[in-house]
Amino acid sequence: MTDPHPNRPHRNFYGRRKGHDLRDSQERYLAEDLAKLSPGAVDWDVNPDRTPLDLKERFGGKDIWLEVGFGGGEHLVHQAASNPDVAIIGCEPYINGVAMLLGKIRAAGVGNLAVYPGDARDLFDVLPKGSVAKAFLLYPDPWPKARHHRRRFVTTEHLEPLHRAMRPGAEFRVATDIEDYVRQTMEEVPKAGFEWLAEAASDWREPWCDWVSTRYEQKALREGRVPHYMTFQKRSL
């Protein structure tokens, strides 16, 4: 069969798209809410020319924040409720997490969120250059085996397009409880054009002042792992 999008780059995707069966209510949230929360034409089938999203039209000129891999959506909804004058795009390929987020959005009544249920690289394709004012990468999949480290988010394949999408001076927050992920983050993120802002140990040992702890973080703490909270800033040219 001929590829309808011959210019589409080959991108391996690792990880699950779906886990356990969704509840009836979650299926309803997906059917009723997901399309309304789209940030715009992201998928190749609807935007084969990779035309940049019109974020001003979609969000009314608000600052744009981005969370890559929002899990169950606790942090995303918290930030949306705390920052109503900001528009936040959440990207998550795991449909169970997306369904959980939609339930939280309904419960919280927030109206400044958009959701892309797919690969962040496809979203990066169509984010306008310099459009993102703040980005979050919180407890990403650690891919603990050495041969799988290239699958981690903190690689050139992800960091370069993220850097392009962020405005000069924009903040990039990374949280992880995996020591080797800290190491790779500290090696790769500065090389991609970001400056680490820590001045004291407390800057990475203590969470941000607007932080809300997630289910994953609570599990990590119960199991004796130590969270690290790293703050970077896109260097100005």
Curated annotation (Swiss-Prot):
Record bears the keyword tRNA processing: yes
Xref: SUPFAM superfamilies: S-adenosyl-L-methionine-dependent methyltransferases
Active site: D141
Residues that hold substrate according to the record: K145, D177, T214, R215, Y216, E217
Annotated positions binding S-adenosyl-L-methionine: E67, E92, D119, D141
Keyword tRNA processing: yes
An example molecular function term from Gene Ontology annotations: tRNA (guanine(46)-N7)-methyltransferase activity
Gene Ontology CC: one annotated term: tRNA methyltransferase complex
EC number: 2.1.1.33
Reaction(s) this enzyme catalyzes, per UniProt: guanosine(46) in tRNA + S-adenosyl-L-methionine = N(7)-methylguanosine(46) in tRNA + S-adenosyl-L-homocysteine
PROSITE patterns: SAM_MT_TRMB
Keyword terms, alphabetized: Methyltransferase, S-adenosyl-L-methionine, Transferase, tRNA processing
Protein's pathway: tRNA modification; N(7)-methylguanine-tRNA biosynthesis
HAMAP family assigned to the protein according to its UniProt record, in alphabetical order: tRNA_methyltr_TrmB (MF_01057)
Family assignment from sequence similarity: Belongs to the class I-like SAM-binding methyltransferase superfamily. TrmB family.
Function: Catalyzes the formation of N(7)-methylguanine at position 46 (m7G46) in tRNA.
Entry protein name: tRNA (guanine-N(7)-)-methyltransferase
Gene from which the chain derives: trmB
